[in-house]
UniProtKB/Swiss-Prot annotation:
PANTHER family: PORPHOBILINOGEN DEAMINASE. GO terms for biological process: protoporphyrinogen IX biosynthetic process. The modification S-(dipyrrolylmethanemethyl)cysteine is found at residue 238. It comes from the Bacteria. GO terms for molecular function: hydroxymethylbilane synthase activity. The lineage of its organism: Bacteria, Bacillati, Bacillota, Clostridia, Eubacteriales. Keywords: Porphyrin biosynthesis, Transferase. SUPFAM superfamilies: Periplasmic binding protein-like II (SSF53850), Porphobilinogen deaminase (hydroxymethylbilane synthase), C-terminal domain (SSF54782). This is Porphobilinogen deaminase. Belongs to the HMBS family.
Amino acid sequence: MNELIIATRKSKLAQVQTEIIMGKLKSKFNIDSKKLLIVTEGDRKLDVSLNKIGGKGLFVKDIELALLNKEAHAAVHSMKDVPFEVSSEFEITAITGREDIRDVFISNGDISFKDIKKGAKVGTSSIRRAAQLKLLRSDLEIVPIRGNVQTRLKKMEEQNLDGIVLAAAGLKRLGDENLITDYFDPKEFLPAVSQGALGIECLKDGDANKYFEALIDAEATLTVEAERSFMKELQGDCHSLIGAYSEIQGDDLYMIGIYDIGGKIVKKDILGCKTNNIELGKKLAQKILG
């Protein structure tokens, strides 16, 4: 095979993430690859909140179509955007590693989160982030904003917000770590399921899958699979009020989860053998559901 074609979203972050995978392929196999840029439904409908336009697969379906049409050998996704069940034609061939999983606060004026004024306006499009912000500071006014990192930063200025909440992973991959004012403790302010992880999706039995399988990160796979199992048991998606944190502790996996039940955020944790990661995620969900 002379060249691999990798489908991805058009955003700057999606392209940077795909270039990370392209670099790994080049160093491991000395094989060239190129990007196929796709505008997804989630990218087209920026004026509507994600939970109103339907959660599952908004950033994935259009890219999967390129795989079905054999226009690309693989797709690179942020795993937090991937529904817990992928269509039978596809597989998540590799989870390639996780960047910093934490959420961060970017201040419009270099004021730390704990010091922002009473009634401060904080921008986020995530109901998970909004709910956890309210738990920390019930006085905050949550302002829904959507778009890529650059768009949200621009909206923070235009709408005179006191700050916004974003994922550390995206900022670090873009080289914008210097914008971060505060990091939230991921055990207290739980990230999205699979936050910070990159996944490679292929058609089952695709002729190029072997290249992507070589990029699997075992530890990241264990934690992401556990978190996705947790989400699946709750029948949630990336726009539900679900958060998860997991870490490998020697031979064990420790996991914390949150879920909204009747307007109340329920938080539980679990510890068990890491080889039972999928079952652990399921049990944590059952523990939360009571």
